Amino acid sequence: MMMAVLNISLAFIFSLLGTLMFRSHLMSTLLCLEGMMLTLFIITTITSLNSHSMVMYPIPIVILVFAACEAAVGLALLVKVSNTYGSDYVQNLNLLQC
């Protein structure tokens, strides 16, 4: 059990590092965010099953709802940016450029 939690935590850390390293493309950032949400869902599911508390059972469902909303908004933003600028480079979105 402890090894599974360690692997899931490492997956979250690698997704976070991927978000920080591959931030030039919006699609890769969205994929890393989805990986982070998936690991959060798995961790909260394991925690709620181990705690045997009725209060903890809806928390994984709430995280799934947030993940679905994040995916929908992210894909809508990706479509809008690619239609407007022709690519998914994040540098095009910087408003501080002269």
Swiss-Prot record:
It comes from the Eukaryota. The chain crosses the membrane at residues 2-22, 26-46, 59-79. It is found in: Mitochondrion inner membrane. Keywords: Electron transport, Membrane, Mitochondrion, Mitochondrion inner membrane, NAD, Respiratory chain, Translocase, Transmembrane, Transmembrane helix, Transport, Ubiquinone. It catalyses: a ubiquinone + NADH + 5 H(+)(in) = a ubiquinol + NAD(+) + 4 H(+)(out). GO terms for biological process: ATP synthesis coupled electron transport. Its main location: mitochondrion. It is a multi-pass membrane protein. Its EC number is 7.1.1.2. GO terms for cellular component: mitochondrial inner membrane; respiratory chain complex I. Core subunit of respiratory chain NADH dehydrogenase (Complex I) which is composed of 45 different subunits. Belongs to the complex I subunit 4L family. This is NADH-ubiquinone oxidoreductase chain 4L. It comes from Phodopus sungorus. The gene is MT-ND4L.
